[in-house]
């Protein structure tokens, strides 16, 4: 049996569709015959149902995965307030320990063929005084998929994020253009520009361009993603 594959999903900002794209990837992996699981290691914003605290993003990932991870592995750190994780964690008396997440990821890898790890916010969101989500991605040692929210300013945001990923020594396995502003002029031209620059500077392929969907359907969106291209990139980046 081949070793499990895993990837870290980050974005150009918060609220640009990381969970939507992560769920679409899960549908695509499942359609490819893989046991697909998801982690949302740090989630900020919880609601209570049936005596348990839950998170909407984690719920969406659970709905798309065909392997259900225990909540403590899927989301080791569930914070109640929907705000910057390090601020909420300090107020709730929680230490966002990267080692705990790495251990949860190791256990998740024993349960599935591919694990989608969704970050929180953008690529460099503080988790503590001196550590951020980029440090988490490095500790996990995973290839990164960048979700670009296609709106005004996305070109600079995407190129800066790609530079930050490369500076940490992580491979950019690919990127997804997610149309979040349906009224944006020249959206296709922006995507074409990013396709050329990210390919030239980082050899990062466009995995798919997602049209604005209302309501969003990760299953439908999965058909616009080149899952096989991503799987090949993940296999190439896997430790030998």
UniProtKB/Swiss-Prot annotation:
UniProt GO molecular function: ATP binding; dethiobiotin synthase activity; magnesium ion binding
Cofactors required: Mg(2+)
Binding residues annotated for ATP, in chain numbering: 15-20, 57, 118-121, 178-179
Record-annotated active site: 40
Assigned keywords, A-Z: ATP-binding, Biotin biosynthesis, Cytoplasm, Ligase, Magnesium, Metal-binding, Nucleotide-binding
Localization in the cell: Cytoplasm
EC number from the UniProt entry: 6.3.3.3
A GO biological process held by the record: biotin biosynthetic process
Listed Gene3D superfamilies: P-loop containing nucleotide triphosphate hydrolases
GO cellular component: cytosol
Catalytic activity: (7R,8S)-7,8-diammoniononanoate + CO2 + ATP = (4R,5S)-dethiobiotin + ADP + phosphate + 3 H(+)
Cystine residue pairs: none
Matches recorded under CDD domains: DTBS (cd03109)
Subunit record text: Homodimer.
Free-text function comment from the UniProt entry: Catalyzes a mechanistically unusual reaction, the ATP-dependent insertion of CO2 between the N7 and N8 nitrogen atoms of 7,8-diaminopelargonic acid (DAPA, also called 7,8-diammoniononanoate) to form a ureido ring.
Name of the protein in question: ATP-dependent dethiobiotin synthetase BioD
Record organism: Burkholderia pseudomallei (strain 668)
Gene: bioD
């Amino acid at each position: 049996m081949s070793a499990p594959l895993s990837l870290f999903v980050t974005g150009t900002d918060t609220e640009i569709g990381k969970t939507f794209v992560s769920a679409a990837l899960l549908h695509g992996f499942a359609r490819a015959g893989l046991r697909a699981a998801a982690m949302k290691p740090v989630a900020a914003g919880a609601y209570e149902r049936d005596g348990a605290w839950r998170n909407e993003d984690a719920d969406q990932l659970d709905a798309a995965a065909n392997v259900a991870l225990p909540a403590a592995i899927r989301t080791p750190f569930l914070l109640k307030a929907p705000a910057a994780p390090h601020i909420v964690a300090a107020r709730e008396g929680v230490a966002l320990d990267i080692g705990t997440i790495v251990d949860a990821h190791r256990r998740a890898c024993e349960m599935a063929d591919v694990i989608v790890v969704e970050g929180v916010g953008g690529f460099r969101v503080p988790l503590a005084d001196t550590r951020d989500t980029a440090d988490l991605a490095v500790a996990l040692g995973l290839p990164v998929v960048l979700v670009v929210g296609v709106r005004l300013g996305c070109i600079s945001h995407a190129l800066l994020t790609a530079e930050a990923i490369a500076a940490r020594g992580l491979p950019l396995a690919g990127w997804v253009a997610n149309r979040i502003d349906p009224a944006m002029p020249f959206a296709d031209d922006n995507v074409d520009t990013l396709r050329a620059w990210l390919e030239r500077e980082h050899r990062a392929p466009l995995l798919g361009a997602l049209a604005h969907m209302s309501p969003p359907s990760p299953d439908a969106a999965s058909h616009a993603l080149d899952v096989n291209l991503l799987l090949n990139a993940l296999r190439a980046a896997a430790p030998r």
